[in-house]
Amino acid sequence: VYLTMTDWNNAEIYAKKVMNKYPLTSNNNYLAGFSDINTPSWIWGMEQSEEQNMGDYSPYAMWYIGTEDGGYGYWSFKCFFLAQSFVDKFEANDVRASQFRWEWDMVHYTLKFRDNEAGRGSIVFMRTESMLLNAAEALCRQGKNDEAKTMLWQLQDMRGATRSVSTGKELLEEIWLERRKELYGEGYGLF
């Protein structure tokens, strides 16, 4: 809320408080697919029970969910694909890029979201990475470029992305790009 209110100081303070309580998503957890409510970095999520979800299975069915071996996932309606321009934002050694799959020689899908064995993957609403990126943006907007970069580097280093060397407006743009790359499909924006 403080970020939206442009209260940069409080946005920084409270994002850091939350970050102190939850770890970042390990690469192993990231690559396992987002379906487990018990993932340590999930601050807020919703488990899909049989009573809540009687037949449509998880909302991840709206994504084209393939399997690692090229098969089709549970109840995939094949509605959401990744644009080539978005996929191109990821460097080859970025662990997040390893989840992209090319289908029909024309579209990308992702293994980021997967159903669990019961076909009802939990839904993530907020992760520690969101707080990290909020803190980095708040720091940048306060002119604390070195602190903002140090915050951003935690995520970039973990994922295998190149560290940002920018300052000012360019650093802010890189923080926003990293937000898009890290949090895509998690409800922060679909376009």
Where are these regions (language model features)?
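Acidic/polar-rich alpha-helix caps and helix-coil junctions
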Residues: 1-72, 84-191
